[in-house]
């Protein structure tokens, strides 16, 4: 198995577990270790191995691990836990995940069927891409004028889903004020190790949602300029 596949499987659970040990370590992981890791990955891995699947594998492992944390540690799929997550919250998350997955598979399917003979050639995909915008290493495909709208739909669904997951995990670990049907998280550091893991996983999901929101805003601004 290539190193680009092994590293995300080891690093993601290990870093989140490390962050759950103490709030100081959580700050260290999110403010220093993760940014440094991706800076090194961009400068070293991409430079010497541009076709690496490291970032794509990181995306896949992140999605699977966060879903595992939610289902096993929060909902209690395999054993009985206090039912703090309502059915509609769970349904909203499942529908969001399903929508994100469906839009991603559609993107992948359309890109795999592309047989362009003109446009820019992507040095990573090694195919012609007409109206190329950029190569998304996290999805392992090129984004162009032909799929930019679907890409933005994927971003929107993923932002909403990861944001919703972040809210549920953090409010489960640190329940705060009830705003209508929504339980907001409070500032705390839980006593139980499981709750600490839920909290840092929720923070991680929130960071992902924030970064993707900035990307979506950037894409929307560029699209408006081209109108």
Region locations from a protein language model:
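Hydrophobic alpha-helical transmembrane segments that serve as membrane anchors
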Residues: 1-114, 145-227
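Hydrophobic, well-ordered secondary-structure segments
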Residues: 102, 119-122
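Short cysteine-rich clusters marking metal-coordination/redox-active sites
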Residues: 113-115, 122-125, 136
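Short metal-coordination and nucleic-acid-contact micro-motifs, chiefly zinc-binding Cys/His arrays
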Residues: 118, 132
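Cys/His-rich microdomains that often coordinate metals
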Residues: 129, 143
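Short amphipathic alpha-helical segments embedded in low-complexity Lys/Glu-rich regions
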Residues: 139-141
């Amino acid at each position: 198995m290539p190193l680009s596949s092994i590293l995300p499987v080891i690093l993601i659970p290990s870093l989140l577990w490390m962050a759950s040990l103490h709030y100081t370590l959580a700050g260290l992981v999110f403010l220093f270790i993760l940014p440094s890791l991706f800076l090194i990955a961009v400068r070293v891995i991409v430079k010497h191995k541009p076709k690496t699947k490291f970032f794509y594998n990181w995306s896949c492992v992140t999605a699977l691990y966060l879903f595992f944390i939610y289902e096993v540690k929060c909902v209690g799929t395999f054993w009985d836990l206090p039912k703090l997550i309502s059915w509609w919250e769970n349904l909203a998350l499942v529908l969001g995940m399903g929508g994100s997955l469906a839009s991603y598979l559609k993107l992948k399917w359309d890109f795999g069927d592309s047989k362009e003979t003109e446009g820019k050639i992507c040095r990573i995909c090694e195919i012609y891409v007409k109206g190329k915008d950029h190569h998304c290493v996290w999805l392992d495909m090129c984004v162009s004028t032909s799929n930019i709208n679907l890409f933005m739909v994927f971003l929107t669904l993923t932002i909403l889903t990861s944001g919703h997951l972040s809210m549920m995990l953090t409010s489960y670990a640190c329940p705060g004020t009830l705003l209508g049907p929504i339980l907001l998280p409070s500032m705390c550091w839980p006593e139980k190790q499981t709750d600490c893991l839920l909290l840092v996983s929720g923070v991680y999901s929130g960071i992902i949602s924030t970064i993707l929101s900035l990307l979506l805003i950037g894409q929307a601004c560029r699209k408006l300029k081209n109108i």
